[in-house]
């Protein structure tokens, strides 16, 4: 095929060479030479050089066709002229069309490819809408709480920005690095950051300039320039708003936390319905025992439900046996000293994880971790020491602990303090007797299983616990004997038959259901349970006691002991639990009958329910303080305050000023003394009066009888709450300062505006002076004795001293009649004159007695004169208002009492506002806090809520709870069967 094409090409070439085609040129016409054509073919006979074959096909070339691949230079081969055809426009058009098609095709293909790539990237991006809940709610609320316009106005200009941020480049670099970390895939964060224009202060220099350009920061006329101080103030204001917002959120959370804590503390009292969890059989039984333990301690009784009581001499290995059964070193250990100071109830149950927890705590201790084991031992030791009262060594309070783990036998064991024979130094004198009484209290339960622990490494004759056990269970129907430290016994005891006698029950004077021999370690407290088990198994495998058949295989190892104790425990439970349930059912019936007969119309409210009822009543009574009318508050405050300060006003201000000779001196003296009184004593006295008034009103609402509905069972509680609330309440410290200014301004005012105020001041002055005159008359009557009417009517005579004072009074009255403008004090010559006159009549008088009598006589005379002056001043308001100078009618004392009266009214009004607006609410808050504290203190509730009714309701609640839980346990026990 290639040869055919080449031959055809040669024919075409020859035809072209011999044709008359030519090119029109400006030069003379030349003939094209055949050799000058640059057309070569590989198959031409005259070809000398091998060139790349020209791939052509049979087609006629023209000026409109596509140009050949290689340019050929055509020369004229014949002489003469040929027509020149210029096709440069066609060539240019074809090239332009080629570029257009290329661009158009590239654009279409590139657009399609870009769209496909964008769709692929969009599909690869995760959908972040599902994760919006991760972002806090306040992030979405930023736009509501941040005023962007105000922040934009507060932002500095470009020039000021450089001054405010000298380290602009470093901040920009840090922000760029942060943006590089969070930019891929985190559009949500960028939106939150972009919500605040404060980014202008944090962006890079390039970004800042770019944003300033976009937002028009190049123009200084767009924003008003403000000073640096105003900018700082605006930013601080925004910061304070944000702080206040989060402070309110924090306070709300604290309040909710406190309410939730209170609900948790009262979950049993208010009957909060919680999701019922299916409990295991042993957990249900342990819960019953916990309730019974509290019931027994409260009423000095002992239930008869089965439990395994672990008793033994001190350091006999009780705790070690219990730890081997629980498969964890959970108890604090000591070398020979007493470590078990109170009974510890351990509830063993099977579970997937080896954990321990206390009855009153939700924390779980992982017994596979050494740090949790150490924390558990420390917690048990702390609880033991806290349960021991001052001056004692052991405690009767039971510590309840639950242990769950794989392979544990279900049972309830109680580890008791070890029995001692001698009280050592540091122990309480009654320690031995207390331990015996605790052990007897647990062992005298006819359904209790006694696990008697005996140290095999000591002589049997030194045992104390065996005698005690034989006394409590002489037939041995519920006793299991355990011999510990058999490895030491085998080494130390010369006769192995002695161990055999112990295990067979022939050596000790006691009987038992079964006898076991165990090894609980080598005496090293750091040994693990696994190593102790391995040592125990290895010892008994190699022991001569087993090889010589002195011990049987089922009598050794703690595993066999645990199985035997568990079987005995559940056998005892099944035999006795229904009988105990019937006993509590009978007790419940008796208590309910007693309640119906004694309190037929009252609900059975226990102590906690009564406390809640009393709490609501107390809070209602506190709310009643806000219902007191303002008029009542002001009347009480004004009356009480005047009773407190009237003596000071009369004795220290009015009387000394009234002794002056003219009105100017009177007013000056009054102003000075009022100023001193206001600066030092008056505000403090006013606050004291207000606080006492609040106490009196609070006490009145707390103690007033409510008629038939009043329940005196709450009286002690209400009194305690009232006293504690008043003790905690303190008046606002700034009240005195504000009162001082108000009182000073009130006393400075002297202008009485109308006749009504004038008459009110006169009435106020008359009442005050009449009261003082009455008191003075009473004092004088006591000094001089009864007058002639009382002496004749009531047959009362005067004493010798009263006769002397009566004569002295008569002489002094004569002196006043002679000089009605006499000064307040007697001169020495006047005292001598009075004494001489009395001596002339045979009456010897002491000068001090004369002066004392003169004080009361002159006081009565002055008060009567002042009252007469009040009557004269009733018509003096016109002179006062017109500022007439009339020496016969100067009513400065009326103005003084008007100032005092006005000060009292303004002070009472101010104190009333403080009471109703602030102090009553603060007192209510204190009452709530006191009630919450009392609610958490059970001892306080027991002390304040007492009586037969309360005790009977408590008994009913406990017995019902015990019976219900026992019935639920019995039902679960039958289902397990």
UniProtKB/Swiss-Prot annotation:
Organism, as annotated: Gallus gallus
Transit peptide interval: 1-86
Lineage: Eukaryota, Metazoa, Chordata, Craniata, Vertebrata
Name used for this protein in its record: Dynamin-like GTPase OPA1, mitochondrial
Function: Dynamin-related GTPase that is essential for normal mitochondrial morphology by mediating fusion of the mitochondrial inner membranes, regulating cristae morphology and maintaining respiratory chain function. Exists in two forms: the transmembrane, long form (Dynamin-like GTPase OPA1, long form; L-OPA1), which is tethered to the inner mitochondrial membrane, and the short soluble form (Dynamin-like GTPase OPA1, short form; S-OPA1), which results from proteolytic cleavage and localizes in the intermembrane space.
Coiled coil: 224-271, 911-977
Gene Ontology CC terms: cytoplasm; microtubule; mitochondrial inner membrane; mitochondrial intermembrane space; mitochondrial membrane
Taxonomy, superkingdom: Eukaryota
GO molecular function: cardiolipin binding; GTP binding; GTPase activity; GTPase-dependent fusogenic activity; membrane bending activity; metal ion binding; microtubule binding; phosphatidic acid binding
Region entry G2 motif, spans: 338-341
Region (Paddle region): 753-873
Self-association and partners: Oligomeric complex consisting of membrane-bound and soluble forms of OPA1.
Transmembrane regions listed in the UniProt entry: 96-112
G1 motif as annotated region, ranges: 312-319
InterPro entries in alphabetical order: Dynamin, Dynamin_GTPase, Dynamin_N, G_DYNAMIN_dom, OPA1_C, P-loop_NTPase
């Amino acid at each position: 095929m290639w040869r055919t094409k080449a031959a055809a090409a040669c024919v075409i070439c020859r035809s072209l060479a011999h044709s008359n085609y030519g090119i029109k040129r400006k030069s003379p016409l030349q003939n094209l030479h055949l050799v000058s054509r640059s057309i070569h073919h590989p198959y031409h006979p005259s070809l000398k050089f091998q060139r790349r074959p020209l791939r052509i096909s049979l087609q006629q070339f023209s000026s409109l066709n596509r140009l050949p691949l290689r340019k050929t230079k055509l020369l004229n081969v014949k002489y003469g002229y040929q027509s020149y055809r210029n096709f440069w426009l066609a060539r240019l058009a074809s090239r332009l069309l080629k570029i257009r098609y290329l661009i158009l095709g590239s654009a279409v293909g590139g657009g399609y490819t870009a769209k496909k790539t964008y769709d692929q990237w969009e599909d690869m991006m995760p959908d972040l809408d599902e994760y919006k809940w991760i972002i806090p709610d306040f992030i979405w609320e930023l736009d509501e709480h941040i005023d962007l316009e105000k922040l934009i106005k507060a932002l500095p200009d470009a020039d000021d920005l450089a001054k405010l941020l000298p380290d602009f480049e470093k901040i920009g670099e840090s922000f760029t690095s942060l943006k590089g970390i969070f930019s891929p895939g985190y559009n949500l964060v960028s939106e939150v950051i972009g919500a605040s224009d404060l980014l202008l202060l944090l962006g890079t220099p390039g970004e800042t300039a770019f944003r300033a350009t976009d937002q028009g920061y190049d123009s200084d006329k767009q924003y008003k320039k403000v000073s640096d101080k105003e900018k700082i103030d605006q930013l601080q204001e925004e910061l304070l708003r944000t702080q206040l917002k989060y402070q309110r959120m924090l306070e709300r959370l604290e309040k909710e936390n406190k309410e939730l804590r209170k609900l948790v503390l009262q979950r049993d009292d208010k009957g909060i319905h919680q999701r019922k969890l299916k409990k295991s059989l042993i957990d249900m039984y342990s819960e019953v025992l916990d309730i019974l333990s509290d019931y027994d301690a409260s009423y000095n009784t002992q239930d008869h439900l089965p439990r395994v009581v672990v008793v033994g001499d001190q350091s006999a290995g009780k705790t070690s046996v219990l730890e081997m059964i629980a498969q964890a070193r959970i108890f604090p250990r000591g070398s020979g000293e007493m470590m078990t100071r109170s009974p510890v109830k351990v509830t063993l149950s099977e579970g997937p994880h080896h954990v321990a927890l206390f009855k009153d705590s939700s924390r779980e201790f992982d017994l596979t971790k050494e740090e949790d084991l150490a924390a558990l031992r420390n917690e048990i030791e702390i609880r033991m020491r806290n349960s021991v009262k001052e001056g004692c060594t052991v405690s009767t309070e039971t510590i309840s602990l639950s242990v769950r783990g794989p392979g544990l036998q279900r049972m309830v064991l109680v580890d008791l303090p070890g029995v001692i024979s001698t009280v050592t130094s540091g122990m309480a004198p009654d320690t031995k007797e207390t331990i015996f009484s605790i052990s007897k209290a647990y062992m005298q339960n006819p359904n209790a299983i006694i696990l008697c622990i005996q140290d095999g490494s000591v002589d049997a004759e030194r045992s104390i616990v065996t005698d005690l056990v034989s006394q409590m269970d002489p037939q041995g129907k519920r006793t299991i004997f355990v011999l510990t430290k058999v490895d030491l016994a085998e080494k130390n005891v010369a006769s192995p038959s002695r161990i055999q006698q112990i295990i067979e029950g022939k050596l000790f004077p006691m009987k038992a259901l079964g006898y076991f021999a165990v090894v609980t370690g080598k005496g090293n407290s750091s040994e693990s349970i696994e190593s102790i088990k391995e040592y125990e198994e290895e010892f008994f495998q190699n022991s001569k006691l087993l090889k010589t058949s002195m011990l049987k295989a089922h009598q050794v190892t703690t595993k066999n002991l645990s199985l035997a104790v568990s079987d005995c425990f559940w056998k005892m439970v099944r035999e006795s639990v229904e009988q105990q349930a019937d006993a509590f059912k009978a007790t419940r019936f008796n208590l309910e009958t007693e309640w119906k007969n004694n309190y037929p119309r009252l609900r059975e409210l226990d102590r906690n329910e009564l406390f809640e009822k009393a709490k609501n009543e107390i809070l209602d009574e506190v709310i009643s303080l806000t219902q007191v009318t303002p008029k009542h508050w002001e009347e009480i405050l004004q009356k009480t305050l005047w009773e407190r300060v009237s003596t000071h006003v009369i004795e220290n201000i009015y009387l000394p000023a009234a002794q002056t000779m003219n009105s100017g001196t009177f007013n000056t003296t009054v102003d000075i003394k009022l100023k001193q009184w206001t600066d030092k004593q008056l505000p403090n006295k006013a606050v004291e009066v207000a606080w006492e008034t609040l106490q009196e009103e609070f006490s009145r609402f707390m103690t007033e009888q409510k008629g038939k509905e009043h329940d005196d069972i709450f009286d002690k509680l209400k009194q305690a709450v009232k006293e504690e609330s008043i003790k905690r309440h303190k008046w606002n410290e700034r009240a005195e300062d504000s009162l001082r200014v108000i009182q000073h301004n009130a006393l400075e005012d002297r202008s009485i505006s109308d006749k009504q105020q004038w008459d009110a001041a006169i009435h106020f002055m008359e009442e005050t002076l009449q009261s003082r005159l009455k008191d003075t008359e009473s004092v004088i009557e006591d000094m001089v004795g009864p007058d002639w009417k009382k002496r004749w009517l009531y047959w009362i005579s005067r004493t010798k001293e009263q006769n002397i004072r009566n004569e002295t009074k008569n002489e002094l009255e004569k002196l006043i009649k002679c000089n009605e403008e006499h000064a307040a004090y007697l001169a020495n010559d006047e005292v001598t004159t009075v004494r001489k006159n009395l001596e002339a009549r045979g009456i010897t008088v002491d000068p001090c007695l004369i002066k004392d009598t003169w004080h009361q006589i002159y006081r009565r005379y002055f008060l009567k004169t002042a009252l007469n002056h009040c009557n004269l001043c009733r018509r003096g308001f016109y002179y006062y208002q017109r500022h007439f100078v009339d020496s016969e009618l100067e009513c400065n004392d009326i103005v003084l009492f008007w100032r005092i009266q006005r000060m009292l009214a303004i002070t009472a009004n101010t104190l009333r506002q403080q009471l109703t607006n602030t102090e009553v609410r603060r007192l209510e808050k204190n009452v709530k806090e006191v009630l919450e504290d009392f609610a958490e203190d059970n001892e306080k509730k027991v002390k304040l809520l007492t009586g037969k009714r309360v005790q009977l309701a408590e008994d009913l609640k406990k017995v019902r709870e015990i019976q219900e839980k026992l019935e639920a346990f019995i039902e679960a026990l039958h289902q397990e069967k």
